[in-house]
């Protein structure tokens, strides 16, 4: 009753096992056998190549070496050129590269730690050097202070010994020491006074020489100035004389032209007029000016002869007939 298939009661574990073992697996077995036969035929076709292909072997070796050098990851250029990898593989490759960035970050962090450790070591060395320098300076100062203190103590002890010796010495020795000290002081004072006197005498002579040199320079400057003034005055006088000589020469040339013109009277002039021209005092004056016997004075207001006298004193009075 419990083992029949049509029973409505609950099935036992043994019934379930019997049902599962007793199922028809013919279709599944056929599919497995067909897949096994197909794989065996493909394997036989692949293994049928008995000879070694050198080209394929070289390419395989090159691919293997390249893969080892590149950590088994193809380059981006190879991914772009060869489309058989597909977008899925490229995305997986990029994801894997991003996942591998932690290696670079870890390396950079290690380098930063190394650099910081080096800087800390350098700072520690600098601090040690500074501490050593400060320590050496402090030691030198301490030694110098101890040396000064020792010298002061020695000087103090010498003074105490000298005082004790004076106190314990007889009066004669004390007087002798005081007298000797006084004589030495007088000698030093005399020597200093002599040096001061010599120095004062030297300074006096030096000041006198400087003052004398200053006065001499002033006198020489005045002499040079007076000489230069005389030279300038002589130049001015010479220049004035040259100008006067030029003017006198020009005036004499003009007077000569007038004298010649009055002597060569035109034929249209009457003899009476010609006689008056030749006998006139003006023609005689022009003749004397042309011969440089009469000149114009420096102020240009009168005629003078060679002696410097005014020629009007020698001319006849034109109004004598009317007086």
Swiss-Prot record:
BP-aspect Gene Ontology terms: protein import into peroxisome matrix; protein import into peroxisome matrix, receptor recycling
Intervals of motif WxxxF/Y motif 1: 89-93
Placement of sequence motif WxxxF/Y motif 3: 141-145
Lipid metabolism recorded as keyword: no
Cross-link (Glycyl lysine isopeptide (Lys-Gly) (interchain with G-Cter in ubiquitin)): 19
UniProt PTM comment: Monoubiquitinated at Cys-8 by PEX2 during PEX20 passage through the PEX2-PEX10-PEX12 retrotranslocation channel: monoubiquitination acts as a signal for PEX20 extraction and is required for proper export from peroxisomes and recycling. When PEX5 recycling is compromised, polyubiquitinated at Lys-19 by PEX10 during its passage through the retrotranslocation channel, leading to its degradation.
Keyword annotations of the record: Cytoplasm, Isopeptide bond, Peroxisome, Protein transport, Repeat, Thioester bond, Translocation, Transport, Ubl conjugation
Knocked-out gene: effects: Cells are unable to grow on solid media with oleate as a carbon source.
Subcellular location: Cytoplasm, Cytosol; Peroxisome matrix
Known role: Coreceptor required for the peroxisomal import of proteins containing a C-terminal PTS2-type peroxisomal targeting signal, such as 3-oxoacyl-CoA thiolase. Acts via its interaction with PEX7, promoting association between PEX7 bound to cargo proteins and the PEX13-PEX14 docking complex. PEX20 along with PEX7 and PTS2-containing cargo proteins are tranlocated into peroxisomes by passing through the PEX13-PEX14 docking complex.
Family, as annotated: Belongs to the peroxisomal targeting signal receptor family.
Protein name: Peroxisome biogenesis protein 20
